[in-house]
Amino acid sequence: MCELCQTMDLTCLYVCVRIQIKGGAVIMCTAACFKDKDCYFGKNLDYEFSYGEQIVVTPRNFEYGFRYTDEPSYKYAIIGMAHVSDGYPLYYDAMNEKGLGMAGLNFVGNAYFNPVVKNKTNVCSFEFILWILFQCETVEEAIHLINEMNLCDTPFSASFPPASLHYMISDSNKTITVESVKQKSIKTYKKRQT
């Protein structure tokens, strides 16, 4: 029995929900990862309008052009939901060919991204999903990269400022939430083991 929902006969790993009401419109994201004999990862985007999102496949070794850091030497293929601007996939959520999934969820009023920091791996918030999924097979590998990086506040463009997000990262064995908040920098939360 799932300790979170008390109804499903599955081993739930994590559920992350964030709701914000603006002018009568409900803006919400829900992400979930659970497993029985298989592992399931998914997210919805409950907006009353579209940003032009589409299913996007980014092939192995795609040259993304990260703003402040070198390209990883090898990059996994990725599929997910993204808005494409100037040839760059701005992923909302995605999964790589190794089965590592990642979703960005609303965190308005709480998300804080830092200015660029010298002598640190600086990854822009809009690059974060690609940065992790290009080079990690597991949540543990993602945690290692996250501990070495600065999630910075550089906008993609004048039309696309940093989105106020926190993130869920999941593989078949583990799920974490990643939050970049003021005074704590990047914090990871693991699902409590039972």
What are the functions of these language-model segments?
Residues 1, 134-137:
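Short, surface-exposed alpha-helical recognition segments that flank or form part
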